[in-house]
Amino acid sequence: MDLRKFIRDIPDFPFEGIIFRDVTPLLKNPQAFQAAIDKMAETVSDIDFDLIVAPEARGFIFGSALAYKLHKGFIPVRKPGKLPYETTSIEYDLEYGTAKLQIHSDAIDKGEKILLVDDVLATGGTANAIAQLVKKLGGEVAGTCFLVELTYLNPRERLRDYLIRTVISY
């Protein structure tokens, strides 16, 4: 199945000159969504890991579905004020400012191997910040997995220390 047919291009969103790769048509189609999760699972089949960590919002969708398929635990990474227990935070730079992410401080045990999952790998900023959170808690980033990679933004440069697996590249 050609999953690209289920990814809609939205020009000038969220800013002029940006082409947003919208995965919601893929999520709407049960066969495409299942194929996407199956392909993501195939791409990480050789990676030894204990848990999947993924950011809100679309990362939750792909990360939790992949965790279910692979019989792994799932750890959410959220924006500040969304997690009910003690958290560990990281602030990181965006093209247009800064952002902050949080994870429960007890979410990862020392030495646990983590697979970081998200829908789109754009600049690599969010993924790099999450990797830093994982390390802060004593975890090891075993690899990363994304449905879509925007190669023209050179995200691998920022994530050069990590194994990167993607299903679709633009």
Curated annotation (Swiss-Prot):
CDD domains: PRTases_typeI (cd06223)
GO biological process: one example: AMP salvage
Pathway: Purine metabolism; AMP biosynthesis via salvage pathway; AMP from adenine: step 1/1
Keywords from the named record: Cytoplasm, Glycosyltransferase, Purine salvage, Transferase
Enzyme class, UniProt record, top EC level: transferase
GO cellular component, one term: cytoplasm
SUPFAM superfamilies linked: PRTase-like
InterPro entries the UniProt entry points to: Ade_phspho_trans (IPR005764), PRibTrfase_dom (IPR000836), PRTase-like (IPR029057), UPRTase/APRTase (IPR050054)
EC numbers on record: 2.4.2.7
Protein's job: Catalyzes a salvage reaction resulting in the formation of AMP, that is energically less costly than de novo synthesis.
Subunit structure: Homodimer.
Family according to the record: Belongs to the purine/pyrimidine phosphoribosyltransferase family.
PANTHER family, per database record: ADENINE PHOSPHORIBOSYLTRANSFERASE
Protein name as annotated: Adenine phosphoribosyltransferase
Species the sequence originates in: Pseudothermotoga lettingae (strain ATCC BAA-301 / DSM 14385 / NBRC 107922 / TMO) (Thermotoga lettingae)
